[in-house]
């Protein structure tokens, strides 16, 4: 009897397991994903970080004469794992300074070494300083110009307790005759300065001769402030020595060769450096450690026949952030022309629960609709579901469907989030070259850019799960073939329908928020804009997937009917939103205006075409602040072409910060002012047309753009 019950229980469990497998779907087969799960190693990825940056070290000047230790290590491991075409490339960029000695002392009322650059490299803000100087310490509070008024700082060190802005404090101090500045370097004045009082955030100050700037933790700054408040005379000694060294963009390139059936290629990687003095285990090296493991696992699975050999050559890039990617693409235009997508891994390895974090994928912006987003999202959500214990499957045991953990890692939940675009990493640069790219990142990161960004914050389980997602997504993009391309297009279509539904939900919420008839009619316009905008984006996504097919030139013939079907989805959702409009019109005692006429302001905006006064680029107008230039042009963190910075230019009228990167791109597309307004309102939230016009007028005044009246349509000749 017991044996029969046992066999029956196994049968039930088998049925349940089958149901789980049917529910959990992604773009690769269950067998392929299971092979990836079994091979990808979070422990190896963590070992890579321990090889690359086991601690934050002071780089010896001799490294600038050859290759950096991180480059040599990752190149050696790539060769060991079977990557091909492994090379370290250098692009000289002039001269820079490397600190070799840095000691900050209190000499009275007692001798105390406060910081040593070899203990905390971030403590030396003035990385070019060469001086042995001593002076009394004086408190200048927040370090504003008013704080310096009437204060004699000549020959002294100043102490600032402002949470940031050490460079400005130093400049004011030295201008007033001070020999140096000590100030807090933290991420804002909020919880982080309280929760992490010993943390120093990386900052750089260019020092004048015989002066120095030191970055303090919030705790150390308060200790010094307390001593001064007690009336104690505090004397500071700063000892600094730095050497001028040849600067360069250094990167490591490696490949997994395609099968030769296509000239197309793909890219994946992270930044090995973000400057050569600042280092970090998560924000610098985790993406490189992860993608090195992704490549190792992929190569082994190909060799074992568990994954097909890629049709497209895979380029692994481990670079100086942004500028290194740009240097490589400029040096290899043949590669830039054939890469069809990039997976950028920026900060990947935190134990999520320690940092209140999610593992996030930042989508491409709506100005760059792409197939690539849904590949990453499908893989992330698949792994997240597998690792989640689902109560409806408890008959199979109180456990996740698949245990995706590392031997020495956590057993935490896998918190993932698909988020709107943000820039400030290498995916921005790829998009500036016309290559779709997404970024994966753990955020928030309580230790990034700081003295506490060290390997002890990392989790080998997080590495393993991220490696499974990354390997799966890479295999989809690299493998090719019409069958897999069709899977991606189908995924794009279905997820696109969901996103149009989200746009409808935004629109109907605008209607529900309306408290007057006038507001309701305006909300109906906004609702229509939101739904229509998302539909246009999704048509672009479908079209973009054509590059994955064996014959991309013939793909539009197959994809056009699918794109056209999206218009019917938009029409249906607009019609159902119209019913909600009627509901709220009755509530407010007004009649719906199904086709609202344009206001005089909208007519004027529709008639004004935005043109660049200079060169129009992929990223916007070349002269536009924050536009970042075009293909191969210069630019920094958060530049256009998918940048994440303000992009607002000089002081004056400005849109909300999160809209400005897209605005910069839209300026170069020869759209009307109304089309720009509708695009921003559709992608984000309704923005007043008057605000958009004020920003455009301000840009016109600065000479960045010109507003040109739309040419009148040709007169229709009357029939005789």
What annotation goes with each model-predicted range?
Residues 9-18, 299:
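Hydrophobic h-region of N-terminal signal peptides that target proteins for export
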Residues 21-31, 35-38, 42-43, 47-154, ...:
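Noncatalytic luminal/extracellular "stalk/propeptide" segments of secretory-pathway proteins
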Residues 29, 107-108, 116-150, 201-281, ...:
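Soluble metallo-hydrolase cores and metallopeptidase-like ectodomains found primarily
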Residues 32-40, 53-65, 124-128, 139, ...:
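Second-shell loop/turn segments in exported
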Residues 39-40, 111-114, 211-214, 221-222, ...:
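Metal-dependent peptidase/peptidase-like ectodomains
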Residues 62-67, 72, 115-212, 279, ...:
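Extracellular/luminal Protease-associated
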Residues 300, 312, 385, 446-497, ...:
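His/Asp/Glu-rich mid-to-C-terminal helical/loop segments that flank catalytic regions of hydrolases
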Residues 622-626, 654-685:
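Short amphipathic alpha-helical interface segments
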